[in-house]
Regions:
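C-terminal catalytic/acceptor-binding lobe
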Residues: 1-44
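Glycosyltransferase catalytic domains, chiefly GT-A lineage
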Residues: 18-21, 38-236
Length: 236
């Protein structure tokens, strides 16, 4: 991938040396070296397919790749020949080796897998990651920026297994709602009786108007074109 870049660097060096030799009065300035950690010029991506596109988004770090791979495999095993599966993985440190392994294992004619580095968006943010969570839990919040050219997308946590065609979920009508999710009955039960600390967290930290409407964010249908107007104020 870098061969053309190496050639360009060396050819430019030769040409610049030639210019200096030919014109002793040439004005130029040499500055210190600069290294870029991320060279992604634009986080916006386009749909992988022109028709029957089913966009599915995951977020993961390199440590979670084995679990992520199981989730990806479950999506691919249950796919239909009638649709194209546009899988996007939001990440910041998955190794090239692991990316290659995943693509080699799962890429097919109607499955596209792409890795998008969104780490730079969160680099200067002092975000809280309690207990066993990592910063990747926030990555879903930039989907409306990364996927501006998508109407509707599915977000899935990496620690689940899909046992049916994910296209069925994508086709679920959600009316005028921006997000579709499932109510978290476990949290509702904890809030009501079993976990006083959960009740305090919901009331004092989250300040939820209706704690019993708390939902599980591990499976979401999101309308990206509309969410763009709401989410940026949360993280920027």
């Amino acid at each position: 991938m870098r061969v053309s870049g190496f050639w360009a660097e060396r050819l430019w060096g030769i040409y610049f040396t030639y210019l200096k030799e030919q014109n002793r009065n040439l004005k130029y300035k040499e500055v210190q070296k600069t290294f870029f950690k991320s060279t992604d010029s634009d986080l916006e991506i386009l749909p992988a397919y022109n028709e029957n596109n089913i966009p599915v988004v995951f977020a993961s770090d390199n440590n979670y790749v084995p679990i992520l791979t199981v989730a990806l495999k479950s999506v691919c095993v249950n796919r239909s020949d009638l649709f194209n599966y546009d899988i996007i993985i939001l990440q910041q440190n998955i190794t090239e080796e692991n990316k290659s392994r995943i693509k080699k294992e799962l890429n097919s004619e109607n499955v596209s897998i792409r890795f998008i580095d969104v780490g730079q968006v969160f680099k200067e943010r002092n975000l809280v990651t309690p207990a066993h969570f990592t910063i990747e839990i926030y990555f879903r919040l930039v989907m409306q920026d990364v996927m501006k050219h998508y109407d509707k997308v599915i977000y899935l946590d990496s620690d689940l297994v899909v046992d049916k065609d994910i296209a069925n979920l994508y086709s679920t009508p959600i009316g005028d709602n921006l997000v579709a999710a499932v109510q978290d009955v476990d949290s509702a039960g904890c809030y009501k009786e079993f976990d006083p600390s959960r009740k305090e967290y919901f009331d004092k930290n989250l300040c939820l108007k209706d704690p019993y409407s708390y939902f599980n964010s591990g499976v979401l249908i999101m309308i990206c074109r509309c969410l763009e107007n709401y989410i940026p104020q949360i993280i920027y």
